[in-house]
């Protein structure tokens, strides 16, 4: 079951959430109830969320509540299901790999020649590939975009350079490494195999938005766990309020 809770920015949503978590903790282990509760938050928010949990739950520790990021949950599930055989490459490793690729492909680039030593360009390319993958834009989708642009258009030439870099990057990691975005996709496809997930009640908080990959994870968790609860920030008077 999926439950959505939303409120205005000025409301104490953490207080509400931890009160609901407290109620669920009281039912841990009862027939039909979860055995544990996982609170999923953004990577950079895990420490603050733990502090908030100690404060709102008024306890020195908790056994049945675990606060973790989606990437950490992915690692747990893939370790359990045996889906993490390839070496994980993070954004820093991808930065180095992209720098190597851009230098090697310099003669084949039209617009971005000589950019292999530019940290800002490599960072931009790193972030762009990450976003393309998060939004399920693969090489074929990127090629379709390029085909819609007029010949000799500067934007088209830029896209063709990005396509070449993206293609070489995929070739370099294929079968050897797995990046964060593909790691998350692999996680989503293994959730149904996890005996860990089926006994967990999930709470999700602290996210401003969800990428398609994250939405797929939420769908799989909803189908295969004791339930998913999402806490959102929304102004009920906003033009988008009706989607909730």
Model-derived regions, located:
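Conserved RecA-like helicase ATPase core segment
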Residues: 213-244
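Structural motif
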Residues: 6-10, 41-45, 204-212, 233-235
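Conserved P-loop NTPase-based nucleic-acid remodeling module centered on helicase motor cores
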Residues: 33-144, 150-153
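Hydrophobic helix-cap positions at the C-terminus of alpha-helices
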Residues: 20-28, 57, 190-194, 220-224
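A general structural motif
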Residues: 32-36, 197-200, 225-227
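Conserved helicase core region in the C-terminal RecA-like lobe
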Residues: 66-72, 201-210, 214, 229
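Accessory N-terminal region flanking or inserted into the helicase ATPase core
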Residues: 1-5, 13, 104-206, 213, ...
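Glycine-rich P-loop/Walker A and Walker A-like loops and their local beta1-loop-alpha1 context
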Residues: 1-54
């Amino acid at each position: 079951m999926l439950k959505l809770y939303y409120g205005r920015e000025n409301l104490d949503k953490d207080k509400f959430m931890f009160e609901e978590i407290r109620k669920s903790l009281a039912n841990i282990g009862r027939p039909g109830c979860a055995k544990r509760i996982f609170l999923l938050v953004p990577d950079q928010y895990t420490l603050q969320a733990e502090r908030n949990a100690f404060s709102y739950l008024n306890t020195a520790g908790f056994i049945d509540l675990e606060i973790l990021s989606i990437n950490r949950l992915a690692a747990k599930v893939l370790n359990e299901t045996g889906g993490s055989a390839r070496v994980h490459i993070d954004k820093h490793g991808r930065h180095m790999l992209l720098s190597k690729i851009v230098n090697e492909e310099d003669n084949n680039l039209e617009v971005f020649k000589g950019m292999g030593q530019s940290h800002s360009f490599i960072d931009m390319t790193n972030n762009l590939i990450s976003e393309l993958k998060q939004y399920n834009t693969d090489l074929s989708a990127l090629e379709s975009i390029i085909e819609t642009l007029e010949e000799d258009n500067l934007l088209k030439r830029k896209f063709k350079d990005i396509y070449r870099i993206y293609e070489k990057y995929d070739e370099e990691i294929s079968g050897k490494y797995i990046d964060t975005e593909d790691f998350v996709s692999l996680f989503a496809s293994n959730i149904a195999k996890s005996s860990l997930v089926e006994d967990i009640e999930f709470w999700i908080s602290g996210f401003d938005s969800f990428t398609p990959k994250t939405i797929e994870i939420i769908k799989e968790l909803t189908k295969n766990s004791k339930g998913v609860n999402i806490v959102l920030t929304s102004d009920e008077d906003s033009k988008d309020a009706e989607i909730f």
